[in-house]
Every structure is written in C-alpha cells, then in structure tokens.
Amino acid sequence: MSASDFSSAVVVLAAGAGTRMKSDLQKTLHSIGGRSLISHSLHAAAGLNPEHIVAVIGHGRDQVGPAVAQVAEELDREVLIAIQEEQNGTGHAVQCAMDQLEGFEGTIIVTNGDVPLLTDHTLSALLDAHVEVPTAVTVLTMRLDDPTGYGRIVRNEEGEVTAIVEQKDASAEVQAIDEVNSGVFAFDAAILRSALAELKSDNAQGELYLTDVLGIARGEGHPVRAHTAADARELAGVNDRVQLAEAGAELNRRTVIAAMRGGATIVDPATTWIDVEVSIGRDVIIHPGTQLKGETVIGDRVEVGPDTTLTNMTIGDGASVIRTHGFDSTIGENATVGPFTYIRPGTTLGPEGKLGGFVETKKATIGRGSKVPHLTYVGDATIGEESNIGASSVFVNYDGENKHHTTIGSHVRTGSDTMFIAPVTVGDGAYSGAGTVIKDDVPPGALAVSGGRQRNIEGWVQKKRPGTAAAQAAEAAQNVHNQEG
C-alpha cells in the first residue's frame, strides 16, 4: 500500500523569531525563487494532498497569518492556523497544532517553514516508509560529510532508532555517525497525541522538545524508525542571510537545469535566475544576465537577453526581448523588443510589433505590426495595426491632475518629435510632420503639422549674451563669412 491509501495531515512549524536574520520581516516570509520560505513549505505539504494542513505561527503572526492565507488561496485549499503564543519549544508548537486536529486519526507529518528545498516527493517517500511497516515515529534523516552540530541518529541492530544524541552530549563514537536528524517526522496521530501530554521541560532550555516524543514512544514499546532522504540538500534550513542566499542559489540551479532539460538553451546558468513559477517553452535561448520572475510565461523559439529582467510577463512564440525590463505585460508572437526598453504594467505589444531602443510604455495597447522604434514614451494609449511612431515622440497623458488616453489608428505615420496632448485621436492612415504638437483630433488620411515658419533673429546672441563663448564664436564666424563675401 502507498501513502495515498492512508489519511494524513501535515503540520508546518513557523512560529520562531528568526533573530539571526536581523530583519523586521519574520524569517519564513523571506523569499527565494519567487516564493516565501513558508510558501515553499506549504506547497510541498499540499503536494501530498493531505486531509489537513496546519501552520503554527507565533512571532510576527500579523505578517505570517495573511501570508499563509494568500498561499492557501493560491493552492485552492484550506490551511488551518494554530497560534503559539509563547515560543516554548517544538513540542509545545505541535501541541498547539493538535488543537486543530482534534479527532484526526492517521499519520501526522511535522515539517518546518524554513526548509524551502524540501519537495513533496521526499515527504511522500517519508510517508510511504512510515505506513509500509506500522511505526509510531519515522524520523527523516540525512547523511552529511560533516555532521558537526546536528543530532546523531543512533540505531540498534534491527535498524530502529534508539536515540537522537545532540552534539554536546555525544561521545566520540556517536560523533562519528554521519546520519543526522533533519527535524522532519512522521507520527502515528494517537501515539503522538498521548506522548505530547507527557512532555516535560526539565532541560537546559526549559522547553518542550518534540524529539522527546521518540523516547516516550520507545518507552511504551512502540517502534521508532528512520528514513534517509535521497538528497540532504533538500533539508537545509534557513536561519540567516547567508543560508538564505545558499538555498536560493541551489533552488535556482535546480530550476535552471529543469528548464534546460525541457528544451531551453541557457548560455550562462551562473548568471541566469528563474523563479519557480516561470514557464519556458522549447528552443528558447536565454542569454547571460537574465532574470525571469513571478509567473512569467515564455513561448517557443523566444530569445531573451542579455541583461533582461521580466516579471509576470507573457512572451509569444518567436519573439525577441533584448536588454529590457518588463513588468505585467504581454509581448506578441514574433515581436521584437529592445535594447534598453522599459515595459511598465498594462502593456500589450501585438504580433510582429516592435518596441525599440530607449522606449518606455505603460498601459499601452500596440497593434499587430506597429512599431515604436526609439526614444519614445507611450502611456495610456492605443495604437492600431501597422503604424509607425517617429523617434522622440511623447504621449503626453497627464495634465497635472488626471491621466488621459490617446488613440492612434492603423497605418499611421508620425514624424519625429511629435507630441500627442491627450485626450486626442489620430485617424487611420494619418500622418504628422516632424515636431508637430497634436492637441486636436486628426481625421483619417490627414497630415497634421503645427508651428509657423522658422524666424531667425540676427545678432541676438551678441546683443543678449555679449562676451560669452557663443558670442565670440558667432562673431568669428560672421567675420569669416564677411571676408569671403
């Protein structure tokens, strides 16, 4: 029988202060790979499809509670909350959780909110090992080349766990053991409930230790076994910023490898960062210095980078995005973006469209084949199909109090340095001359021009700026002109 044939519940411990993070943000809310630490733990728990998930929170619960609720919404399932008013040890934390599991009979897995690399696959293997042979407690263990600081797993000849011995209490013989406690357990619910009632705080810390449940269970004749994780790196806890960075790097390494095995070419994995929710198609090329964040979706045959950051972006098949920062927007199939393009939320670039160098967009819809080649701001605007916006154009959308919309039709050609003073509409097929300030609607097919003939005021610089370098240069040039004349 497998774990899926048995009822299970998962308890996630996340009540600690995490003082070593030296942060106003509660420890489990720090993020790697686009998710908070506790979000990673809750996703792993949900992967078991347990009957119940309980998050035990305490320190910083005003921050952690809403975060847990948000993850529950993402998972589309209930996550129960247990409050540990005083952080009185791991045993006390699980006692608090049991109030939410009244009447539950089955297997309870206890894990932590600061082990972001732990997968549902490993938790499922622990659950399978626990139910395969009836056991009171199954400890998830790991083997380390350097086990210093960890509680050693002592087994008898039958392979049962007889003790978890902390480093400070271990003899030389025990210190030589490389199998250590991960802090993740599977318990028989009834035995756990009974043993928790017997916990005592007669130890150096004056706390209730969850590990004492193992001794109580063995004292009552119940078997305690261990299951060794296939990859010890999954069980690395995060207690400070160094460990946060290390866990983030390892998670990213795994994510990048998965993308490459899925058909993407990543030129330099060391400088490419991909969040866990990102989706990447086949035959994608990702150049160095690229960050793909949030729920970004990359289609097939897309080229991204170098030096590009995309957050919650959707990139259509065959598109190219170079040296661009983009947020919460959509790029159509076979479109080209960059270099040095800033795409702000609410932008949609149609298929075969173009956003060129030093272009900024916000709340802009740009139709199929339309181009904004360079040095332009497009905000609060709609541009039809196959239109071209000249260089250095500005969509002037703010009057000091309110934002206004500009509508550009299809097959429009605007000259360089055109200003669109919103609200304004430019009809299909219209043109504008260079330097035009468009304040009124332009009919379809019309040419818009503004400003009178150029007037040159001779001698203005020498009169108004006498003695300046400009005046001296002008006078010298005029003298040469007069001599040649």
Swiss-Prot record:
GO terms for molecular function: glucosamine-1-phosphate N-acetyltransferase activity; magnesium ion binding; UDP-N-acetylglucosamine diphosphorylase activity. Coiled coil: none annotated. In the N-terminal section; belongs to the N-acetylglucosamine-1-phosphate uridyltransferase family. In the C-terminal section; belongs to the transferase hexapeptide repeat family. It is found in: Cytoplasm. Residues 465-485 are annotated as: Disordered. Pathway: Nucleotide-sugar biosynthesis; UDP-N-acetyl-alpha-D-glucosamine biosynthesis; N-acetyl-alpha-D-glucosamine 1-phosphate from alpha-D-glucosamine 6-phosphate (route II): step 2/2; Nucleotide-sugar biosynthesis; UDP-N-acetyl-alpha-D-glucosamine biosynthesis; UDP-N-acetyl-alpha-D-glucosamine from N-acetyl-alpha-D-glucosamine 1-phosphate: step 1/1; Bacterial outer membrane biogenesis; LPS lipid A biosynthesis. Homotrimer. Residues 469-478 have a biased composition (Low complexity). UDP-N-acetyl-alpha-D-glucosamine binds at residues 13-16, 27, 84, 89-90, 151, 166, 181, 239, 344, 362, 377, 388. Gene3D superfamilies: Hexapeptide repeat proteins (2.160.10.10), Spore Coat Polysaccharide Biosynthesis Protein SpsA, Chain A (3.90.550.10). Residues 242-262 are annotated as: Linker. It catalyses: alpha-D-glucosamine 1-phosphate + acetyl-CoA = N-acetyl-alpha-D-glucosamine 1-phosphate + CoA + H(+); N-acetyl-alpha-D-glucosamine 1-phosphate + UTP + H(+) = UDP-N-acetyl-alpha-D-glucosamine + diphosphate. Mg(2+) binds at residues 114, 239. Its cofactor is Mg(2+). Binds 1 Mg(2+) ion per subunit. The active site is at residue 374. Acetyl-CoA binds at residues 391, 397-398, 416, 434. It comes from the Bacteria. Its main location: cytoplasm. Keywords: Acyltransferase, Cell shape, Cell wall biogenesis/degradation, Cytoplasm, Magnesium, Metal-binding, Multifunctional enzyme, Nucleotidyltransferase, Peptidoglycan synthesis, Repeat, Transferase. This is Bifunctional protein GlmU. Residues 263-485 are annotated as: N-acetyltransferase. One of its GO terms (cellular component) is membrane. GO terms for biological process: cell morphogenesis; cell wall organization; lipid A biosynthetic process; peptidoglycan biosynthetic process; regulation of cell shape; UDP-N-acetylglucosamine biosynthetic process. Pfam families: Hexapep (PF00132), NTP_transferase (PF00483). Catalyzes the last two sequential reactions in the de novo biosynthetic pathway for UDP-N-acetylglucosamine (UDP-GlcNAc). The C-terminal domain catalyzes the transfer of acetyl group from acetyl coenzyme A to glucosamine-1-phosphate (GlcN-1-P) to produce N-acetylglucosamine-1-phosphate (GlcNAc-1-P), which is converted into UDP-GlcNAc by the transfer of uridine 5-monophosphate (from uridine 5-triphosphate), a reaction catalyzed by the N-terminal domain.
